[in-house]
Amino acid sequence: MTTSLQDGQSAAGRAGAQDSPLAVQVCRVAQGKGDAQDPAQVPGLHALSPASDATRRGAMDRRKAKDLEVQETPSIPNPFPELCCSPLTSVLSAGLFPRSNSRKKQVIKVYSEDETSRALEVPSDVTARDVCQLLILKNHYVDDNSWTLFEHLSHTGVERTVEDHELLTEVLSHWVMEEDNKLYLRKNYAKYEFFKNPMYFFPEHMVSFATEMNGDRSLTQIPQVFLSSNTYPEIHGFLHAKEQGKKSWKKAYFFLRRSGLYFSTKGTSKEPRHLQFFSEFSTSNVYMSLAGKKKHGAPTPYGFCFKPTKAGGPRDLKMLCAEEDQSRMCWVTAIRLLKYGMQLYQNYMHPSQARSACSSQSVSPMRSVSENSLVAMDFSGQKTRVIDNPTEALSVAVEEGLAWRKKGCLRLGNHGSPTAPSQSSAVNMALHRSQPWFHHRISRDEAQQLITRQGPVDGVFLVRDSQSNPRTFVLSMSHGQKIKHFQIIPVEDDGEVFHTLDDGHTKFTDLIQLVEFYQLNKGVLPCKLKHYCARMAV
């Protein structure tokens, strides 16, 4: 009875308020129309307060009554909650499933070194590591943590490594529509190599520690010092810098510190009054120059630059170049460590723990159980046995591979003499072209560029045709941050042609045997062959 009386009073109050000038004035004030007046100064407004309170109490009582009726109704589960049109259910659905609606998809295109491309539809929160993982699984590549995405800016001739944790949507958002920018997938063996062998990346003459740190510091501890929050080494050396708005380059002595990159206005002095700020790296990225001498008139081919994170043209680039590639690698590596810090170390130590967009596309980043359960077996005796020794398993695999190739050569040569020179060379050429490390007819400069792009760490190699000596081959490899070339000489013995690197002391029937031998033995090379350069399609 009380509820009905309150309802009647509130209804009467509403009906009377609709015709009163005071109500019209209050409504205008609430809607922002007319002159804005203080509600306390509107005459007669206090007279409406009791009625409005009664109205609110009546509405609350009605809601409580409805809630009681709902609670008394037997609880029957709804088999189709997504079809329920109740406001309460719609609010719950929106709160329970925000991700499925908010994860927008975006189409990206990734290129390989042979300019083939693949379009991928990825969520907006996908990282560079996620895309690498997806392409590795789709193409059945081996995931050795060296696959890398590169941001290539064609109009300026520069590119950089997209770090594994970076969001691709943020990278692409800084691109300009008119520019021909691309994402490339290729191997970069030097991406985290400085954590393993820092002495190759930080020459002793370019690194100095603070006075309180000098003690027993060695070059092997430089990455740990960079990751420290209270100490840092100082990178210093001569660089050529392009003057803003000019085509000329000026040589100066630079210092890299946590606050940015500085150059000295007076020789090699690092007194504060002689240091001038050049660039910082918190709001900019460091890029490697691919054609600095041709596009920017650089004095050396070992250029790099700073580009603002936000979209900017060629005039916004701060161009630098070093005297040699090892010096450039030192500067770029130190800048990466200062910019990303511990995140870079986490990418190196825990690559599989990064968020993977592959899981959302029903692709597992791990190998299948059947592949992980494979073991090496020996079937040579009366009883089979499992080979537990890894060295023995590797030697057995090599022997089986050699036996398979020998049978293959005999099958290919069954229409003629297997030892005929023409037939043997044709068979060998067919075998060589099937290997990912064989690049056939590429020049010396192209070989050096390919090895440099994939990371000039010790043991990166490829085999190519010799341009100076027909029908011979060249082994190009990296060692000590330098590219070296070794002539593979053909020698004849008892009517058969062999390949050798040491004037016939060690002879091989084909290039596959030669490569496999030097992958296990150093021999006459400066180091073992570890990583091959390959142009793989996506």
UniProtKB/Swiss-Prot annotation:
Transmembrane segments: none annotated. The modification Phosphoserine is found at S370, S373. Keywords: Acetylation, Cytoplasm, Endosome, Membrane, Phosphoprotein, SH2 domain. One of its GO terms (cellular component) is plasma membrane. It holds the Pfam family BPS. GO terms for biological process: cellular response to insulin stimulus; insulin receptor signaling pathway; intracellular signal transduction; negative regulation of insulin receptor signaling pathway; negative regulation of meiotic cell cycle process involved in oocyte maturation. Residues 104-190 form the Ras-associating domain. The keyword Phosphoprotein applies. It is a peripheral membrane protein. Disulfide bonds: none annotated. Residues 1-73 are annotated as: Disordered. The modification N-acetylthreonine is found at T2. PROSITE patterns: PH_DOMAIN (PS50003), RA (PS50200), SH2 (PS50001). Residues 232-340 form the PH domain. InterPro entries: BPS-dom, GRB/APBB1IP, Grb14_SH2, PH-like_dom_sf, PH_APBB1IP, PH_domain, RA_dom, SH2. Interacts with the cytoplasmic domain of the autophosphorylated insulin receptor, through the SH2 domain. Interacts with GRB14 (via BPS domain); this interaction protects the tyrosines in the activation loop on INSR from dephosphorylation. Binds to the ankyrin repeat region of TNKS2 via its N-terminus. Interacts with activated NRAS. Interacts (via SH2 domain) with TEK/TIE2 (tyrosine phosphorylated). This is Growth factor receptor-bound protein 14. It comes from Rattus norvegicus (Rat).
